[in-house]
Design a protein with these regions (language model features):
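Short, small-residue-biased leader/transition segments that mark boundaries at the very start
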Residues: 1-6
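Residue-level recognition of oxygen-bearing side chains
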Residues: 22, 47, 248
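PLP-dependent enzyme catalytic core of the Aspartate aminotransferase-like
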Residues: 127, 186, 193-194, 209-258
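Buried hydrophobic positions in well-ordered alpha/beta secondary-structure cores of metabolic enzymes
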Residues: 12-15, 26, 51, 131, ...
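Active-site beta-loop-alpha junctions enriched in small/polar residues
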Residues: 17-19, 156, 242-244
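Conserved PLP phosphate-binding loop immediately N-terminal to the Schiff-base lysine helix
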Residues: 10-44
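Short, surface-exposed connector motifs at secondary-structure boundaries
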Residues: 7-10, 123
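Active-site C-terminal subdomain of aminotransferase-like
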Residues: 33-36, 42-176, 180-210
């Protein structure tokens, strides 16, 4: 829990890509730093690759200078500045992340990509509501389908994360549903091949519905034992609901599962 994090004297960093700030605000639950892949819902249209780091400025790095020498001792590669002294707790981490990532990796968006991202952010609150509504309906449909062996979506009562979802994500989680197809790997691959609306891709969290069979794509080099250890079942399909009409998505899934 959160207490264990602080006992170990480390900041709590939360990846809020799927929930977005619309559905979850980690700082209100004790997080110190939040990260996002803005390529996903924030952009929403697969138009611009990007990421974001948001620092609450709440973690006291100076209490544990031995653990964080990069923030608490002079940085000889940047004019000998000590970030905690120069920028305080509110600016030490994010300043170091900004200046060093830009300098060493060129981690800054082009003006055109930033423009696309800003356009996406304008409609984020509208899109997230639709993504969540579609995912809830799709998950409920899959839960009742005779050819589906299991469904994981925290909006479903009975899901092992349902109570946590209600606590941290009261307005919905995201549009991504995971489910298993009866018949294992071969059956899951067959379902993927019959889908007509969803595109098969590793991308996720987009305005267009997309899906993935990890065992035969991203994790295809693993054997059955390694897949299980990685938490990837051979019957698993990851289905990312877009903004299409839920009835169309359900009809497409229904015909693919027959």
């Amino acid at each position: 829990g959160l207490g264990d994090v602080y006992k170990r004297q480390v900041p709590l960093i939360v990846d809020n890509t799927f929930a977005t700030p619309i559905n979850c605000r980690p700082f209100e639950w004790g997080a110190d730093i939040v990260v996002h892949s803005t390529t996903k819902y924030m952009d929403g249209h697969a138009g611009a690759i990007g990421g974001a780091i948001v620092d609450s400025g709440s973690f006291d790095w100076t209490k544990h200078p031995d653990k964080y020498p990069g923030l608490c001792t002079p940085d000889e590669s940047y004019h000998g500045v000590t970030y905690t002294e120069r920028f305080g707790l509110a600016g030490a981490y994010i300043t170091k992340a900004t200046v060093q990532l830009m300098r060493d990796l060129g981690a800054i968006q082009s003006p055109q990509s930033a423009y696309y991202l800003n356009l996406g952010l304008e409609s984020l609150h509208v899109r997230m509501k639709r993504h969540c509504e579609n995912a809830q309906r799709v998950a409920e449909f899959l839960q009742q389908h005779e050819n589906v062996s299991w469904v994981q979506y925290c909006g479903l009562p009975g899901d092992k994360y349902y109570e946590l979802g209600q606590k941290y994500l009261p307005h919905g989680s995201c549009g991504v549903v995971s489910f298993g197809v009866k018949g294992g790997r071969a059956a899951a691959e067959a379902v993927m091949g019959r889908l007509k609306i969803a595109s098969i891709e590793t991308h996720v969290a987009d305005s267009h519905t997309c899906c993935l069979h990890p065992a035969s794509t991203t994790h295809r080099q693993m054997n059955a034992e390694e897949l299980l250890a990685a938490g990837v079942r051979e019957d698993l399909i990851r289905y990312s609901c877009g903004l299409e009409d839920a009835e169309d998505l359900i009809a497409d899934l229904d015909q693919a599962l027959q």
